[in-house]
């Protein structure tokens, strides 16, 4: 297998792992369960951001074709959106979890929006837009990492 083919296989595997790590079902969950759902959502979104960044950086370095980058980034954006939607379908069990939900909403929405912007720029083949969108992931990535720390208490 050529290096690009191997890289595409690795990225596809990473993206598939991100997609398979999702939360199933909806409804109210106990306090610890809700915190775990928030932490898992933040982790999935962090992995999606890392996957998208890696794909774009490899493309910018000339090590991956734009079409493969487009697939990688599109899958990352879809995975983050799916994780956000799954969490939105969960009802917090109590006041502390409701507060956590309020804390989680903006970082999750910002990260999903940033990944969508990157996906759109890659889809257009807009190199300047790709660079701006890639930089635009920095803040949301930090916010989601902080959310994960808050949700896990670490």
Predicted regions, residues:
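Alpha-helical segments in soluble extracytoplasmic regions
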Residues: 33-116, 129-153
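Bacterial N-terminal signal peptides that target proteins for export
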Residues: 1-11
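Bacterial signal peptide processing site
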Residues: 23-27
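C-terminal motif of bacterial Sec signal peptides marking the signal peptidase cleavage site
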Residues: 18-22
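Flanking scaffold residues of small Cys/His-coordinated metal-binding clusters
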Residues: 15
């Amino acid at each position: 297998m050529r290096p690009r083919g191997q890289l595409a296989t690795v990225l596809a595997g990473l993206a598939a792992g991100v997609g398979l790590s999702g939360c199933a079902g909806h409804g109210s969950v106990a306090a610890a369960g809700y915190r775990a759902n928030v932490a898992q959502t933040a982790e999935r979104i962090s992995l999606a951001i890392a996957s998208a960044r890696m794909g774009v950086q490899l493309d910018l370095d000339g090590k991956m074709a734009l079409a493969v980058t487009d697939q990688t980034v599109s899958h990352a954006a879809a995975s983050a959106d799916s994780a956000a939607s799954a969490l939105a379908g969960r009802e917090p069990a109590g006041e502390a979890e409701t507060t956590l939900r309020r804390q989680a909403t903006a970082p999750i929405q910002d990260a999903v929006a940033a990944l969508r912007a990157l996906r759109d720029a890659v889809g257009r083949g807009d190199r300047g837009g790709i660079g701006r969108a890639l930089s635009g992931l920095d803040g949301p990535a930090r916010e989601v990492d902080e959310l994960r720390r808050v949700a896990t208490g670490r």
